[in-house]
Amino acid sequence: SYNSPLHFGNGTRLTVT
C-alpha cells in the first residue's frame, strides 16, 4: 500500500502517504 513505508537500497526509509 502507498501508506506503507518503502525501503530503498540506499538504506533510507521513506513513507509515502
Swiss-Prot record:
- Protein's name in the database: T cell receptor beta joining 1-6
Instruction: Tell where it localizes.
Output: Cell membrane
Q: What subunit structure does UniProt give?
A: Alpha-beta TR is a heterodimer composed of an alpha and beta chain; disulfide-linked. The alpha-beta TR is associated with the transmembrane signaling CD3 coreceptor proteins to form the TR-CD3 (TcR or TCR). The assembly of alpha-beta TR heterodimers with CD3 occurs in the endoplasmic reticulum where a single alpha-beta TR heterodimer associates with one CD3D-CD3E heterodimer, one CD3G-CD3E heterodimer and one CD247 homodimer forming a stable octameric structure. CD3D-CD3E and CD3G-CD3E heterodimers preferentially associate with TR alpha and TR beta chains, respectively.
Gene Ontology process terms (BP): adaptive immune response
Organism of origin is Homo sapiens
Protein purpose: J region of the variable domain of T cell receptor (TR) beta chain that participates in the antigen recognition. Alpha-beta T cell receptors are antigen specific receptors which are essential to the immune response and are present on the cell surface of T lymphocytes. Recognize peptide-major histocompatibility (MH) (pMH) complexes that are displayed by antigen presenting cells (APC), a prerequisite for efficient T cell adaptive immunity against pathogens.
* TM spans (from-to): none
Q: What is the gene called?
A: TRBJ1-6
GO CC annotation: what is one? T cell receptor complex
- Write out the coiled-coil annotation as residue ranges: none
> Disulfide bonds, which pairs?
none
Q: What is its main location?
A: membrane
Q: Which keywords annotate this record?
A: Adaptive immunity, Cell membrane, Immunity, Membrane, Receptor, T cell receptor
